[in-house]
Amino acid sequence: MKKVDVKESAVGRETRIRKQWNEQSIFEQSIQNREGAQSFVFYEGPPTANGLPHVGHALGRTIKDVVARYKTMAGYKVLRKAGWDTHGLPVELGVEKQLGISGKHEIEEYGIEPFIKKCKESVFTYEKQWREFTESIGYWVDMDDPYVTLENPYIESVWHILGTIHEKGLLYKGHRVSPYCPSCQTSLSSHEVAQGYKTVKDLSATVKFKVKDSENEYFLGWTTTPWTLPANVALAVHPNMEYVKAKQEGHVYIVAKERVQDVLKENYEVLSVHKGEELLNISYTAPFPMKEVTNGYRVIGADFVTADSGTGLVHIAPAYGEDDYRVVQSEGLSFLHVVDEKGEYTEAVPFLKGKFVKDCDVDIVRYLAKEGLLYHKEKYEHSYPHCWRCDSPLLYYAGESWLIRTTAIKDTFLQNNDSVTWYPDHMKHGRFGKFLENMVDWNISRNRYWGTPLNVWECESCDHQFAPKSIDDLRKHSTKETQEDLELHKPYVDEVQVCCEKCGGTMTRTPEVIDVWFDSGSMPFAQYHYPFENKELFEEQFPADVIAEGIDQTRGWFYSLLAVSALYTGKVPYKRVLSLGHVLDEEGQKMSKSKGNALDPVDLVNQFGADALRWALLVDSAPWNAKRFSERTVLEAKSKFVDTLVNVYSFYVLYANLDEYNPNETYDVKRTKLDEWVLSRLHSTTKKVRIALDDYQFTNAAREIAALVDEVSNWYVRRSRNRFWESGMNAEKAAAYETLHDVLVTISKLIAPFTPFVAEDIHLNLTGSSVHLEDYPVVNESLLQPKLEAEMNAVLQVVELGRSNRNQHSLKVKQPLAELVLLEHNENDMDWESYRDIVMDELNVKAFHVELDETKYTSYQLKLNFKTAGPKFGKNVNAVNGWLKQLSQDEVQNFVSTERAVYEVASGEEIVVTTEDVLVEKVAKSGFSNTTNGQYTVMLDTNVTEELLQEGVAREFIRAVQEYRKQLNLPVNLRVDVILDTEEELQQTLTNHKELLEENLLVKQFTFGHLTNEDDELSLGETKVRIKLSATK
């Protein structure tokens, strides 16, 4: 075995391992070795390569890698195809910035074709960084053969899917109000909108709409979007709701009866009550009368009106509200548009023409006030949608769009979702399920340039539509011969014209591109160019057994995958969804570069290693929980887990090499109870880890492994050191080597999916083979000893209590004590005699015994809890307090046992005192200190005799010399002669414990003599010792 370089950095070790993987094609071998095995399918959600990875990507890649590695080691064939999401607005915006242009007008001036070429060039700007990040974090995914959404085969599959949807009559062109980004100048789908809500404070206004032909009567309407008022065409009331006419300061106001107090506040008089239906068709004067409104400015009925907020009357602007649009359509009222595609007012609002509408709320309110039409204004905090790409506030804007009739197959969506297992479970019928319940038709078109062209050609003569499902299909219907290598992007496909089958007219392509979420939602099919090729491979790889991405994909990729599959095949595309929580900073705030609190995962890997980063992301909390994260989190993972394991591994290699131990040879072995215990712990942990991983409970599995590694290091190895230090090779020493070898090899397999680099380093050195080509460990039931584990757990509890006791009373473990008494509070069949030597050695005591009668060593003190007793006992509280203080120890013991006592006051009244009224404190017998955990109480004799004190000094000297040997980098098996120069009292103490010193320090000869200032000096408290070591001849 190669010597372990404990000074090698984590990133140095991981770089070395990566090189070995690449040279030996270990990733490829891990898949090839499972050829013919059952497939386990997972899909890679495609990232965009025109932005850099963040810590959230590290979590996602870690989880996906853990699943894929575990399932591979569990016997499955796991294909891992990478993917790139290459279309969409982010790419366009990046190119605009690069070119120094902005907006559609400037893009078209620059030229569509050169702009598209620039987009194509820019999409892989950071591919190298993504590849390096992916490899450095240990995520095994095939990046040499990825699916890429901009490539013709991928687009052709998307066309086949959308063409099929059109064929089913589910794709239609409609005029409707959609969420619209004025900055990007395109509409968005409902699931995109759901990703970008922000809490904002907007100016709200309660507006006076004067009843026509009245002197002082007004409808009051409340709006949080004053900018929409110039487009008002109606007011809506609920026909079945009650409204009042109320007089205030000479004006009569009409509001909902339930809202009158909140709106008018005070000094008003209700004149009459009316049903909403009585108000229908009453005309009013609009705040911004428009001549285009030939049918409007009257009250209409709508069932979406409520009295939950506002005035109970809704101002209707059909161009900027979905409900508004529907009700105006049904009423046959006029339609009014006063805002252009840039979100700026048109000449219809002359005094605000050219201004961005969201910046004009104050101007509108000032105008209303000037005209005497403002009743009230205030800032209103509410949730408002923003563009998930550019962060601009959205408008609801009427226009033509291509939509998919998802509502027509809503039941299929819901049924498919019911068959999916969600992690966490509440997502299924909560956030995701509710989104499906409230779905609207999918706005699939985008008025942009860089994307999959929407494959619908429309006839200029008869409005017939043609939706080709393949390139060949398009070629067959083209009016001219198309080039062989036709690129399926604008402007190239726009040049293809089709002959109308219906009337013989010319058909041109509708100019829009497809929503990028449709691109990524098509990946189960398009990644294999289905249905044009790879049908068998597709069928093998559909549906996914699991997908895993961030929670923000609930209304993104998780939805688009489900939607595309339901629309295309009717089937569910995945069996399980792992919805990962946000990675926050240590204050619980979302990380962002603008805030300066973002952590770069590449920097974390370089500083602490990928294993530490992965472990930190897994062990802290379940991955679906939002987690606070910092450099300190990763440092702790490195020091507490990775470094601890490396130290155990290094210890084993060091001594096995010294003793020339060969695990492939046969030795006479005699396993101790400690060996049997650690093997039982190893296999019971394996059992728990497999159960956890099969249920995707990564954190539970990681914590089980962490506990095992800690016990192996801080209990098994520490308790076994003397066996390794012995000279020669006896049966117990051989058993220690064999056991630790088996433990380390099995642990390397257990951790391989979690921390693949250190796992590989250990396994490769101990066995000569890659751990990632091994099977995952299975439980050896014959090695399980639950009773032994329970007993050793009890020993560990007692030892921990003993250490805590020493710490609380400033008694160093090196200082021997006379006695430990263990008080057991519950009788059991624990054989403490078998563990006597372990407890005595661990806690450095000369005697140990178990006592069931705790009254021999402890007593109780009762103190009145005035916080609860004061109100309960009132004037008798002081009397009760005095009575408690004079109770005998037997009476106190009886109270503790029964948890109640009765005190009779002078008047003869009986007062019942319970444990709620009293603070019970356990007090140790004089000369003893106690620590308890409820099940056990450890009593330590704290009287330190002179003899014990001297032995404590000798043990401190041993510790100091051992540290000194480390500083000198002396081989651990080197025997030395020691010369000491110190005061006479210490000389005597060390002489008296010569045998103890020689046994623990590999010293052949101790002598005392005069040393010079050139020799080294050790400190034992305030005492100085000069020391000189020389190798034994």
Swiss-Prot record:
<dbReference type="InterPro" id="IPR009008">
    <property type="entry name" value="Val/Leu/Ile-tRNA-synth_edit"/>
</dbReference>
<dbReference type="Pfam" id="PF00133">
    <property type="entry name" value="tRNA-synt_1"/>
</dbReference>
<dbReference type="GO" id="GO:0002161">
    <property type="term" value="F:aminoacyl-tRNA deacylase activity"/>
</dbReference>
<keyword id="KW-0963">Cytoplasm</keyword>
<keyword id="KW-0862">Zinc</keyword>
<keyword id="KW-0648">Protein biosynthesis</keyword>
<dbReference type="InterPro" id="IPR014729">
    <property type="entry name" value="Rossmann-like_a/b/a_fold"/>
</dbReference>
<dbReference type="GO" id="GO:0008270">
    <property type="term" value="F:zinc ion binding"/>
</dbReference>
<dbReference type="Pfam" id="PF08264">
    <property type="entry name" value="Anticodon_1"/>
</dbReference>
<dbReference type="InterPro" id="IPR009080">
    <property type="entry name" value="tRNAsynth_Ia_anticodon-bd"/>
</dbReference>
<protein>
    <recommendedName>
        <fullName>Isoleucine--tRNA ligase 2</fullName>
        <ecNumber>6.1.1.5</ecNumber>
    </recommendedName>
</protein>
<keyword id="KW-0030">Aminoacyl-tRNA synthetase</keyword>
<dbReference type="InterPro" id="IPR001412">
    <property type="entry name" value="aa-tRNA-synth_I_CS"/>
</dbReference>
<feature type="short sequence motif" description="'KMSKS' region">
    <location>
        <begin position="590"/>
        <end position="594"/>
    </location>
</feature>
<keyword id="KW-0067">ATP-binding</keyword>
<keyword id="KW-0547">Nucleotide-binding</keyword>
<dbReference type="InterPro" id="IPR002300">
    <property type="entry name" value="aa-tRNA-synth_Ia"/>
</dbReference>
<dbReference type="InterPro" id="IPR002301">
    <property type="entry name" value="Ile-tRNA-ligase"/>
</dbReference>
<feature type="short sequence motif" description="'HIGH' region">
    <location>
        <begin position="47"/>
        <end position="57"/>
    </location>
</feature>
<dbReference type="GO" id="GO:0004822">
    <property type="term" value="F:isoleucine-tRNA ligase activity"/>
</dbReference>
<dbReference type="GO" id="GO:0006428">
    <property type="term" value="P:isoleucyl-tRNA aminoacylation"/>
</dbReference>
<dbReference type="Pfam" id="PF19302">
    <property type="entry name" value="DUF5915"/>
</dbReference>
<dbReference type="InterPro" id="IPR023586">
    <property type="entry name" value="Ile-tRNA-ligase_type2"/>
</dbReference>
<dbReference type="InterPro" id="IPR013155">
    <property type="entry name" value="M/V/L/I-tRNA-synth_anticd-bd"/>
</dbReference>
<comment type="function">
    <text>Catalyzes the attachment of isoleucine to tRNA(Ile). As IleRS can inadvertently accommodate and process structurally similar amino acids such as valine, to avoid such errors it has two additional distinct tRNA(Ile)-dependent editing activities. One activity is designated as 'pretransfer' editing and involves the hydrolysis of activated Val-AMP. The other activity is designated 'posttransfer' editing and involves deacylation of mischarged Val-tRNA(Ile).</text>
</comment>
<dbReference type="GO" id="GO:0005524">
    <property type="term" value="F:ATP binding"/>
</dbReference>
<comment type="similarity">
    <text>Belongs to the class-I aminoacyl-tRNA synthetase family. IleS type 2 subfamily.</text>
</comment>
<feature type="binding site">
    <location>
        <position position="593"/>
    </location>
    <ligand>
        <name>ATP</name>
    </ligand>
</feature>
<keyword id="KW-0479">Metal-binding</keyword>
<comment type="subunit">
    <text>Monomer.</text>
</comment>
<dbReference type="GO" id="GO:0005737">
    <property type="term" value="C:cytoplasm"/>
</dbReference>
<dbReference type="InterPro" id="IPR033709">
    <property type="entry name" value="Anticodon_Ile_ABEc"/>
</dbReference>
<dbReference type="GO" id="GO:0000049">
    <property type="term" value="F:tRNA binding"/>
</dbReference>
<keyword id="KW-0436">Ligase</keyword>
